């Protein structure tokens, strides 16, 4: 009984120092092998999918061709280009260039 009373404060201290889920689950930059390791951790046996952009898509992104005459103004073209860029946003843009959480990584699991 005396031994139990000695370890009780230590046990209470360990319980109080346990990280809360919100603290342990921080958004962060994940690039290269760190991103792959995080995907393996999150997806497990389900696996994950990743289709990298080809070199051509990276160097020369396709912007919808507009007909001449009666086309949108320059401001509208910028808005359209931003929308196209948002649609092509992938895991590298989401987690390496920006920051992401493990919950966001789950979107890439099979």
UniProtKB/Swiss-Prot annotation:
Provenance organism: Rattus norvegicus (Rat)
One Pfam family this sequence matches: Insulin
Main location, first listed in the record = secreted
Tell me where it resides: Secreted
Please give the biological process terms from Gene Ontology that the record holds.
cellular response to glucose stimulus; cellular response to oxygen-containing compound; glucose homeostasis; glucose metabolic process; insulin receptor signaling pathway; positive regulation of protein secretion; receptor internalization; response to cAMP
Q: List the disulfide bonds.
A: 31-96, 43-109, 95-100
Q: What is this protein called?
A: Insulin-1
Cellular component GO terms, alphabetical: cytosol; extracellular space
Give any GO molecular function from the UniProt entry: insulin receptor binding
Name of the coding gene: Ins1
Keyword set for this entry?
Carbohydrate metabolism, Cleavage on pair of basic residues, Disulfide bond, Glucose metabolism, Hormone, Secreted, Signal
In terms of PROSITE patterns, this protein maps to: INSULIN (PS00262)
Proregion residues excised on maturation: 57-87
The signal peptide stretch is: 1-24
Its assembly, as annotated, is: Heterodimer of a B chain and an A chain linked by two disulfide bonds.
Q: Which SMART domains does the record match to this protein?
A: IlGF
Summarize the protein's role: Insulin decreases blood glucose concentration. It increases cell permeability to monosaccharides, amino acids and fatty acids. It accelerates glycolysis, the pentose phosphate cycle, and glycogen synthesis in liver.
* Keyword ATP-binding among record annotations: no
What is the similarity comment for this entry?
Answer: Belongs to the insulin family.
Which CDD domains does the entry link to? IlGF_insulin_like
